């Protein structure tokens, strides 16, 4: 007698299941996300196997030989920087980004470059083979050695991987794949989780460097279950304004390199090109004689970046002053205004305050505090800051200036780009000032000291 399939209700947000329908998911608390699905019977030979090729045994950690993991350069220098030097055999990378941002273009360029020395396979679930060929032709990419498979059925993809034994595989995208073992539609939580698990298992067993393309939700998170990001080795986000020519790729998680590393690309007629000096791009339109502008030296992974911080402080025309930020934390702005009022004696309670990090950069580190304050003061007084000045440092609630990481590297980058002055935390002052002959460094320990320096007239 055939076994009756059991009906379950699965959450489209977190993937949790419930035996009966409920308005609110009992796992993540979201409303109206439970959908009816059928639980497929588990076969005798379970698909849940170890990702290791052989059966693992208990052994002493001291007996395990730790070898240096070899890196395979992708041919894209900025992508290699984010990955930690290149692709690792058996690594699974998840690349997410908004529609039209250039994910497929970047990976097609990468595959074409790696095909010169590695056996590659591009699996397209969103475009036909003809569409991929047209895109490669438009980008003027060499297609010799690039193997292409237009398929979304997981079992067919697994067969192709076993037959062709590729070394590098791109799956575009994981949300279009489906497995016959799951009854739900492609793109559902269960399908995404199962397909990602099967691909990850094959990548580990066969030593394939695999890149999965992921869609994002309207909130900017990668679509599908959260376990997808835990399952892979590296999570990359492709960011940028579609109205701008510049794109940024950021590592959120990386088991084989540093997280929070940043790579910058420029979109051209022939695809994406790496930008070796992004600070020059972010400061292309910078003028130091403009009130409300200050240059911040921020740190993205191992790379110092110079970003212009713009502030506009104006009289409020309503009962509630506006506080808006682009690229900076809005809660941080509210805190800095309170500190400026209490410890700097400058009240902005009746002023609208707008902040912008030029170039579409998103800055999350507190080192931006010491650049935001001078920018706001400059706009408030309608007086430019001393010329060729940069700043970085964290400001505490009691008005103290706290040190930040990698102060020496930030100062070297500022001097290299021709800046003459720097306001930094006293603890970040270099031991030997002679190492920076062209940079006058002001070490401050309090907010008031920084304000006094900003009051100096332009030379």
Question: Residue ranges of each PLM-predicted region?
Answer:
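P-loop (Walker A) phosphate-binding loop of NTP-binding proteins
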Residues: 98, 125
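Conserved RecA-like ASCE P-loop NTPase motor core of nucleic-acid helicases/translocases
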Residues: 120-124
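Divalent metal-dependent catalytic cores for phosphoryl transfer on phosphate-bearing substrates
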Residues: 129
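Peripheral, non-AAA+ core regions of ATP-driven protein-machinery
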Residues: 3-13, 17-81, 88-94, 101-111, ...
């Amino acid at each position: 007698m055939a076994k009756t399939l059991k009906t379950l209700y699965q959450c489209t947000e977190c993937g949790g299941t419930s035996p009966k329908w409920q308005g609110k998911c009992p796992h993540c608390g979201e409303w109206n996300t439970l959908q009816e699905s059928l639980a497929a019977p588990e076969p005798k030979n379970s698909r849940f196997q170890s990702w290791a090729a052989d059966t693992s045994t208990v052994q002493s950690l001291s007996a395990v030989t730790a070898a240096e993991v070899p890196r395979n350069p992708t041919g894209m220098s900025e992508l290699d920087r984010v990955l930690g030097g290149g692709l690792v055999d058996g690594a699974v990378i998840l690349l997410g980004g908004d529609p039209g941002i250039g994910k497929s273009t970047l990976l097609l360029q990468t595959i074409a470059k790696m095909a010169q020395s590695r056996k590659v396979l591009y699996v397209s679930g969103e475009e036909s083979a003809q569409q991929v060929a047209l895109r490669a032709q438009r980008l003027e990419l060499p297609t010799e050695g690039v193997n292409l498979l237009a398929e979304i059925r997981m079992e067919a993809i697994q067969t192709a991987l076993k037959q062709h034994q590729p070394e590098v595989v791109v799956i575009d995208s994981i949300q279009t794949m489906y497995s016959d073992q799951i009854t739900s539609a492609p793109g559902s939580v269960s399908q995404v989780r199962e397909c990602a698990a099967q691909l990850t298992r094959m990548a580990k067993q066969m030593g394939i460097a695999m890149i999965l393309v992921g869609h994002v939700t309207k909130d900017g998170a990668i679509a599908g279950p959260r376990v997808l990001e835990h399952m892979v080795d590296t999570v990359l986000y492709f960011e940028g304004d579609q109205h701008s020519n510049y794109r940024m790729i950021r590592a959120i998680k990386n088991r084989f390199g540093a997280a929070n590393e940043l790579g910058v690309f420029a979109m051209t007629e022939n695809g994406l090109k790496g930008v070796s000096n992004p600070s020059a791009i972010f400061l292309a339109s910078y003028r130091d004689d403009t009130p409300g502008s200050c240059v911040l030296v921020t740190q993205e992974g191992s790379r110092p970046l110079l970003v212009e911080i713009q502030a506009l402080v104006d009289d409020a025309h309503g009962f509630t002053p506006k506080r808006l930020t682009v690229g900076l934390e809005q809660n941080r702005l509210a805190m800095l205004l309170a500190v400026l009022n209490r410890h700097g004696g400058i009240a902005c309670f009746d002023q609208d305050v707008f902040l912008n990090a030029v170039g579409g950069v998103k800055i999350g580190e507190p080192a931006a505090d010491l650049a935001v304050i001078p920018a706001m003061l400059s706009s408030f007084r309608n007086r430019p800051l001393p010329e060729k000045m940069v700043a970085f440092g964290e400001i505490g609630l009691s008005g103290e200036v706290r040190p930040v990481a990698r102060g020496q590297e930030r100062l070297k980058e500022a001097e290299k780009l021709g800046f003459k002055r720097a306001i930094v935390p006293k603890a970040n002052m270099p031991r030997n000032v002679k190492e920076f002959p062209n940079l006058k460094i002001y070490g401050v320990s309090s907010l008031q000291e920084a304000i006094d320096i900003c009051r100096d007239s332009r030379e």
